[in-house]
Design a protein with these regions (language model features):
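Conserved S/T- and glycine-rich ATP-binding loop of Class I adenylate-forming
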Residues: 15, 32, 102, 108-111, ...
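Conserved AMP-binding/adenylation subdomain of ANL enzymes
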Residues: 126-143, 153-194
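Conserved AMP-binding A3 loop
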Residues: 103-130
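Proline-aspartate-enriched helix->loop->beta-strand connector
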Residues: 59-63, 190
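Conserved AMP-binding/adenylate-forming
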Residues: 3-45, 147-149
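Conserved pre-ATP/AMP-binding loop-to-beta segment of ANL
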Residues: 90-107, 114, 137-143
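Hydrophobic alpha-helical segments in the ANL/AMP-binding
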Residues: 23-41, 52, 132-134, 153-165
Length: 198
């Protein structure tokens, strides 16, 4: 999927990855980083007006989103679809030169109205990942369950660290207060979950 997806995209362009804690979103993220394509990690259920404004402001070359949302963007060309996610080519023709070190863009926490984006370089991601792995002594026996969205810095760092050590990631859209979440914890033998105070 990664190779098929990214073969449809020019290197060093901007892609809005509308995130869910599902395999299509995760594989897109991994594929984009490996192919030197810069994802902007946004929540899939972002307010439609806010998303439209961000698209007009940042002019991404592509949108990678849950297939069930693709019809909302019928003015964009459907390029690829698989495992519940669709890649759409936008109609922005102007190309922007992106810094070679830029790996991804994340929104700041608490952004309202018009999210601000934080730049992450490949070196930042690697250094942060190695530091967390070392501090927490993570290894391939770990089985983290996604309790935080992957468009959050904390959520994506859990994914990065566990992939780094060859550990397992249990993807779920269920929340801590849902019975199904705890059933998945048990069924898939999760060893950890992360959270932030409310």
């Amino acid at each position: 999927y990664c190779i098929e997806l990214t073969s449809n995209i020019k290197k060093r362009c901007l892609v809005f990855n509308l995130c869910t804690n599902e395999i299509g979103s995760l594989v897109g993220y991994i594929g984009f980083l490996n192919a030197k394509i810069v994802p902007v990690m946004l929540k899939a259920d972002l307010d439609e007006i806010l998303l439209t404004n961000m698209i007009e402001t940042y002019k991404p070359a592509y949108l990678h989103l849950p297939s069930i949302l693709a019809d909302r963007f019928d003015k964009f060309e459907k390029v690829y679809s698989n495992i519940g996610y669709t890649l759409l080519k936008t109609n922005f023709t102007e190309e922007f030169e992106l810094n070679e070190d830029l790996a991804l863009l994340l929104t700041t926490s608490g952004s309202t109205g018009s999210p601000k984006l934080v730049r992450q370089s490949y070196k930042n991601i690697e250094a942060n990942t190695k530091s967390i792995v070392e501090y927490l002594q993570l290894n391939e026996t770990e089985r983290a369950i996604t309790t935080l969205p992957m468009n959050y810095t904390y959520g994506i760092s859990i994914i990065n660290t566990h992939l780094w050590v060859g550990a397992s990631i249990i993807l779920t859209e269920k929340g801590l207060m849902q019975k199904e979440f705890w059933q998945q914890m048990k069924n898939f033998e999760a060893t950890s979950f992360a959270g932030v105070p409310y």
